[in-house]
UniProtKB/Swiss-Prot annotation:
ATP 2 binds at G1175, R1176, T1177, G1178, S1179, G1180, K1181, S1182. This protein has no ortholog in rodents. Coiled coil: none annotated. ATP 1 binds at G544, N545, T546, G547, S548, G549, K550, S551. The keyword Flavoprotein does not apply. Changing R630W: No effect on glycosylation. GO terms for cellular component: apical plasma membrane; cytoplasmic vesicle membrane; extracellular exosome; plasma membrane; vacuolar membrane. Glycans are attached at N838, N844. It is found in: Cell membrane; Vacuole membrane; Cytoplasmic vesicle membrane; Apical cell membrane. The lineage of its organism: Eukaryota, Metazoa, Chordata, Craniata, Vertebrata. This is ATP-binding cassette sub-family C member 11. It comes from Homo sapiens.
Length: 1382
């Protein structure tokens, strides 16, 4: 029998996919989700039909119904188990974590993966918990007011009931911990000294001890389970709440992508730790009270000396933890900066490679890492000292108490001493909880203060009014709008832009892909006194110079700006096409549908009017082709047309088009304008922002913007009659068109990255198939299986300094354990000597009374050895902490630098197939594990594992039978551990891998806020975030529960060793000295908790090593491109002098599994020439640029520059001699000067000269900081046109002999473009200039024209020759462009 089941599984591209039998599709946030049918299995479930509205069943116990059902001791398994077995667990199953047993057993039979793992319980999912958090916060605000509302109280209320149960279990744990040592063990020892005792009584005592230890184990395990599940719920609620607050804004200017990742990985985890570990304070306090009372009754007032030593640990632990948190705060600042720079470098890797900036940027990141490492060492040293202090403090406290007690000549016998030590055992365990609890609470407190800003953040002000007049679509009345901040303080104090110098006070524009065009960094309003009325069905044309406020006008309609005065009114639904297209990871169809229903006829019509048919035929899988992160394998024109198709398919009433025709050639531009804008959108209201003036005469209304004001408004004929600036622009356009026979502001052709990858099938056939194509662009992230290989540990040890260093660390840990055990043995030996007046004698039926050790004549000697041992233990512990901290941080830094250098040296094909979010997961999430968690767990594992071995050796001294039984139990435990750790490893790996799609989703959401809001997909993106968060939380909860599942069972089995020792003490070892019996029983009581802790921390340590495994996996994937410098080969002095470029039978393909894109190119470009490169989509023109920079290596043939084969020299030697002006303008965070001259190779005067040549001097001079004006992430505080001008200034400053201009003036108005062309001719005089798909005026002025087709040279001659040549392809392109002007 089969049943319907839905799974949401994260995939490598940042979305969710399934693996199973497809039943149906569901579009959410541009990604596809499936419903499956699976055979009955452990997690099969019955299909549940939705209940009719208003008939939802009310649980009999209200909100506590599910929790109270858990109190039923045994609950029969339902016929169809719930998706999460925890929901149907009874009390016994819950306490023993037995609900997880079927899944653990299944891991032995078959492979665990996303399909076989049950989904997260609805009680733990984001939906339910974020609603509860919202409700609790609203209640808090209604009671106390917004100013006095406490997030901490909301947190406490969120977990109040569960906290009460946790406290009850903690008290049970404390009572059970004291019951055995104080009441039962003395009876067992007393029984062992009797000659004739009741056997049943003795066995009963031993089993009573065993039972009390089992109760202790169960109560402690249950307490952890409650805390972990509560923390998962709060984590889900907090994450969803923050994301909902973040995404409600249509533009976010106060948080960058790196900072967003840092918040959702850092602060959210701090809150998780606070909820999970904070309740341990209750156990610690209860332990302190119980131990103080019991110790006083055993030994008297001197017991408080030991208690005082433990009490001193608490403020010491708090102090050290606060120091660690403070150091961690400073470390986080540097870490955030490193992650931000890494994110930008990976995003702009193509530009960095073409400009040979790898070494300087690698040095910047390595310097940040070096600074981060120093802070990590400070933080790690405090953490390590805290950990070691808590391990040795019981020994030191015991030594101080014994020394003072004996110095006061107070009575102390073996029975009194070990009863006292047994009483302190509980405090010994509880003291380990102090730093965990204090750190969790301290970190969560600071996270709460930062998170409170999300709570207190008011919703954005929606100023757009709905018009009542149905004849009007848009109305501006005296509207003045600005980009001033609307959501200050949204991120934590460590991440604020102003404090980190990322943005100045005036930088208040959105950081997404909108690209507002007004003058950046201006403190005044960007739009002044706008008065505008657009009738319904009207096409409004918007023109103006670069930075005049055109894009800001659209942003004002989208409610992304701040309305200072006046009003804005809209009537009808909106569609928006941004200047820089926003693409969702997935396939083309998903991007166009954007969650809408698939209508084939309408879909085909949209493809036709947006001129996508031919592109889909060229793409390997048609519209099902995966287009990668940010549309990596598409040209700018293809991305723009997909964005336009999305808008047209959405069928809205008002269309906001931000220069959509700038990224397409003349033929395509004319087709889109005629078929899409004029025909398909007929009857719709269209606001068309454009630099292509030839289309404005078809607009019903035209406005000309200048400095944020409407300087001209009317129809085309009206404005021409006024003979104002608009008329001058049009006349200039026609004058140039007449003189050159052609004037076009659109591009000749566009740049594809998947050139010539044509299918034999037709478009219609490609649209009929729904099968997911294989061999897609984005590589699926491979997850290792099974246990970690020795190779992982070997590489980590090598990174740490080698095996010699590891042996030194191991020696120090062995010494710590030896001194700890020696302290126990020496005290036992000392007690055995008694008063020294009577010789040691064996027990012969009466309890041995060796007298008061304070009366021993050699008291000073025993005290000296005991005290020196404690001092030596402290010194060794401090030295061990220092060395361990240095070594572990050296290892993580070495792995970081090695990975980064390897990734940096990868070819571009690597970055085309690996999402940036996945790489950031390595440099952020995985590295954080190596820096923060792995050192803590590995140090604890070393100490505890050696301690367990030492305890077993001591216990074995009592009897070889105990050793035999202990060995058998330990072997069983080891086999048990090895069998089931596979499942635990799978859970941890899945949790690690599930972070990548979550990161990608956050990045994608921040980049596309405008489109998300305008298409009404906010709820879809929130839902997807919740699904991704629930997937991660599910794996995290299963990992935590599985470690507790194994730890509990191992602890129960080690309790059997305690039972065995008790039986042997009671019945079998009368010849053993009494003091050694007592010592053995006291030590073995620590074995159960120590052994399970060793196993659990061992699992945690191995889980943290999966981060090393992932880093090594990426290192293995990284195949370096050619060396930067060739040994034994150097470029001629002053090369290249002429700039002559020769292609000789050149063949090229992008990757091994892709078609050839350049076929036998034979071409000679003479030095100092300007060559225009044109051709249709897929012709291979952009591939020439890739070949010239050796971003792709040749299959055959070669390229010569001034007679030098470019493959015979290093990449840096080649690329440093070339310059590029890219199609997509790239600016990095920093200053304007940094973006133009990142490494201070030019003077300020030279930079100002370059800015003057690109007509930016006036704009930059307005800023108070001039060249040191800050640039936010992605250059978000500059318009796209301004970014283009800065990129041109960068190339001018570089002054190379060969220049590649790749569609560099697409987003610049025609007047500025004319000036820029003059600048390029003057600045690059004497250089070889290759102009790919530039405006036709520039191509006509070139010395030669190269026409590409199907990866071959079709034509190459002077423009005037090609224009007159019959049948010339260039002439046909010119004719098409000319017709677009008519």
């Amino acid at each position: 029998m089969t049943r319907k089941r839905t799974y949401w599984v994260p995939n490598s591209s940042g979305g969710l996919v399934n693996r199973g039998i497809d039943i149906g599709d569901d579009m959410v946030s541009g990604l596809i989700y499936k419903t499956y049918t699976l055979q009955d299995g452990p997690w099969s479930q019955q299909e549940r039909n939705p209940e009719a509205p208003g008939r939802a069943a009310v649980p009999p116990w209200g909100k506590y119904d599910a929790a109270l059902r858990t109190m039923i001791p045994f609950r029969p398994k339902p016929r169809f188990p719930a998706p999460q077995p925890l929901d149907n667990a009874g009390l016994f199953s819950y306490l023993t974590v037995s609900w997880l047993t079927p899944l653990m057993i299944q891991s032995l039979r078959s492979r665990l993966d996303e399909n076989t793992i049950p989904p997260l319980s609805v009680h733990d999912a984001s939906d339910k918990n974020v609603q509860r958090l919202h409700r609790l916060w609203e209640e808090e605000v209604s009671r106390r007011g917004i100013e006095k509302a406490s997030v901490l109280l909301v947190m406490l209320r969120f977990q109040r009931t569960r906290l009460i149960f946790d406290a009850l279990l903690g008290i049970c744990f404390c009572i059970a911990s004291v019951l055995g040592p104080i009441l039962i063990i003395p009876k067992i020892l007393e029984y062992s000294e009797e000659q004739l005792g009741n056997v049943v009584h003795g066995v009963g005592l031993c089993f009573a001890l065993f039972l009390s230890e089992c109760v202790k184990s169960l109560s402690f395990s249950s307490s952890w389970i409650i805390n972990q599940r509560t923390a998962i719920r709060f984590r889900a609620a907090v994450s969803s709440f923050a994301f909902e607050k973040l995404i409600q804004f249509k533009s976010v200017i106060h948080i960058t992508s790196g900072e967003a990742i840092s918040f959702f990985t850092g602060d959210v985890n701090y809150l998780f730790e606070g909820v999970c570990y904070g309740p341990l304070v209750l156990i610690t306090c209860a332990s302190l009270v119980i131990c103080s009372i019991s110790s006083y009754f055993i030994i008297g007032y001197t017991a408080f000396i030991a208690i005082l030593c433990y009490l001193l640990v608490f403020p010491l632990a708090v102090f050290m933890t606060r120091m660690a948190v403070k150091a961690q705060h400073h470390t986080s600042e540097v870490s955030d900066q490193r992650i931000r720079v890494t994110s930008e470098v990976l995003t702009c890797i193509k530009l960095i490679k073409m400009y040979t900036w790898e070494k300087p940027f690698a040095k910047i990141i390595e310097d940040l890492r070096r600074k981060e490492r120093k802070l990590l060492e400070k933080c790690g040293l405090v953490q390590s000292l805290t950990s070691i202090t808590l391990f040795i403090i019981p020994t030191v406290a015991t030594a101080v108490w014994v020394l003072i007690h004996t110095s006061l000549k107070l009575k102390l016998t073996a029975s009194m001493a070990f009863s006292m030590l047994a009483s302190l055992n509980l405090l010994r365990l509880s003291v380990f909880f102090v730093p965990i609890a204090v750190k969790g609470l301290t970190n969560s407190k600071s996270a709460v203060m930062r998170f409170k800003k999300f709570f207190l953040q008011e919703s954005p002000v929606f100023y757009v009014q709905t018009l009542q007049d149905p004849s009007k679509a848009l109305v501006f009345e005296e509207a003045t709008l600005s980009w001033q901040q609307t959501c200050p303080g949204i991120v934590n104090g460590a991440l604020e832009l102003e404090r980190n110098g990322h943005a100045s006070e005036g930088m208040t524009r959105p950081r997404d892909a909108l690209g507002p065009e007004e003058e950046g960094n201006s403190l005044g309003p960007e739009l002044h006194k706008i008065n505008l009325v657009v009738s319904k069905g009207m096409m409004l044309g918007v023109c103006g110079n670069t930075g005049s406020g055109k894009s800001s006008l659209l942003s004002a309609i989208l409610e992304e700006m701040h309305l200072l005065e006046g009003s804005v009114g809209v009537q009808g639904s909106l569609a928006y096409v941004p200047q820089q297209a926003w693409i969702v990871s997935g396939n083309i169809r998903e991007n166009i549908l954007m969650g809408g229903a698939y209508d084939k006829a309408r879909y085909l019509q949209v493809l036709h009017c947006c001129s996508l048919n031919r592109d889909l035929e060229l793409l390997p899988f048609g519209d099902m082709t995966e287009i990668g992160e940010r549309g990596l394998n598409l040209s700018g024109g293809q991305k723009q047309r997909i964005s336009l198709a999305r808008a047209v398919y959405s069928d809205r009433q008002i269309y906001l088009l931000d220069d959509p025709l700038s990224a397409v050639d003349a033929h395509v531009g004319k087709h889109i304008f005629e078929e899409c804008i004029k025909k398909t959108l007929r009857g719709k209201t269209v606001v068309l922002v454009t630099h292509q003036l030839q289309y404005l005469e078809f607009c019903g209304q035209i406005i000309l913007l200048e400095n944020g004001k409407i300087c001209e408004n009317g129809t085309h004929s009206e404005l021409m009659q006024k003979k104002g600036k608009y008329a001058q622009l049009i006349q200039k356009m026609h004058k140039e068109a007449t003189s050159d026979m052609l004037q076009d502001t659109a591009k000749i052709a566009e740049k594809p990255k998947v050139e010539s990858q044509a299918l034999a099938t037709s478009l219609e056939e490609s649209l009929n198939g729904n099968a997911v194509p294989e061999h897609q662009l984005t590589q699926e992230e491979e997850m290792e299986e099974g246990s970690l290989s020795w190779r992982v540990y070997h590489h980590y040890i090598q990174a740490a300094g080698g095996y010699m260093v590891s042996c030194i660390i191991f020696f120090f840990v062995v010494l710590i354990v030896f001194l700890t055990i020696f302290s126990f043995w020496w005290l036992s030996y000392w007690l055995e000597q008694g008063s020294g007046t009577n010789s040691s004698r064996e027990s012969n039926g009466t309890m041995a009374d060796l007298g008061n050790i304070a009366d021993n004549p050699q008291l000073s000697f025993y005290q000296l050895v005991y005290g020196l041992n404690a001092l030596l233990l402290i010194c060794v512990g401090v030295c061990s902490s220092g060395i361990f901290t240095k070594v572990t941080r050296k290892a993580s830094t070495a792995l970081h630098n090695k990975l980064f250098n390897k990734v940096f040296r990868c070819p571009m094909s690597f970055f085309d197939t690996i999402p940036i979010g996945r790489l950031l997961n390595c440099f952020a999430g995985d590295l954080e594990q190596l820096d923060q968690l792995l050192p803590i767990f590995s140090e604890q594992f070393l100490v505890l594992s050696l301690m367990v071995i030492a305890v077993l050796l001591i216990v074995s001294v009592l009897s070889p039978y105990i050793l035999l039984m202990g060995a058998i139990i330990m072997v069983i435990c080891f086999i048990y551990y090895m069998m089931f750790k596979k499942a635990i490893g799978v859970f941890k790996r899945l949790e690690n891998y599930s972070r990548s799609p979550l990161f990608s989703h956050i990045l994608n959401s921040l980049q596309g806020l405008s489109s998300i809001h305008v298409y009404g997909k906010t709820e879809d993106f929130i839902s997807q975030f919740k699904r991704l968060t629930d997937a991660q939380n599910n794996y995290l909860l299963l990992f935590l529960s599985s470690t507790r599942w194994m730890a509990l069972r191992l602890e129960i089995m080690t309790n059997l060793v305690t039972l065995a020792v008790a039986l042997f003490v009671a019945f079998g070892i009368s010849s053993t000295p009494y003091s050694f019996k007592v010592m053995a029983v006291n030590i073995v009581l620590q074995l159960a908790s120590s052994f399970q802790a060793t196993a659990r921390i061992g699992l945690e340590t191995e889980a943290q090593f999966t981060a090393v495994e992932r880093i090594l996996q990426y290192m293995k994937m990284c195949v370096s491109e050619a060396p930067l410098h060739m040994e034994g080969t150097s470029c001629p002095q002053g090369w290249p002098q002429h700039g002559e470029i020769i292609f000789q039978d050149y063949h090229m393909k992008y990757r091994d599994n892709t078609p050839t894109v350049l076929h036998g190119i034979n071409l000679t470009i003479r030095g100092h020439e300007v060559v225009g490169i044109v051709g249709r989509t897929g012709s291979g023109k952009s591939s020439l640029g890739m070949a010239l920079f050796r971003l792709v290596e040749p299959m055959a043939g070669r390229i010569l520059i001034d007679g030098v084969d470019i493959c015979s020299i290093g990449l840096e030697d080649l690329r440093s001699k070339l310059s590029v002006i890219p199609q997509d303008p790239v600016l990095l965070s920093g200053t304007i000067r940094f973006n133009l001259d990142p490494f201070d190779r030019h003077t300020d005067q030279q930079i100002w000269d370059a800015l003057e040549r690109t007509f930016l001097t006036k704009a930059i001079s307005k800023f108070p900081k001039k060249l040191h004006t800050d640039v936010v992430e992605n250059g978000g505080n500059f318009s796209v046109g301004e970014r283009q001008l800065l990129c041109i200034a960068r190339a001018v400053l570089r002054n190379s002999k060969i220049i590649l201009i790749d569609e560099a003036t697409a987003s610049i108005d025609m007047e500025t473009d004319t000036l820029i062309q003059r600048t390029i001719r003057e600045a690059f005089q004497g250089c070889t200039v290759l102009v790919i798909a530039h405006r036709v005026t520039t191509v006509l002025n070139c010395d030669h024209i190269l026409v590409m087709g199907n990866g071959k040279v079709v034509e190459f001659d002077r423009p005037e020759v090609l224009r007159k040549k019959p049948g010339s392809l260039f002439a046909a392109l010119m004719a098409t462009a000319t017709s677009s002007l008519r």
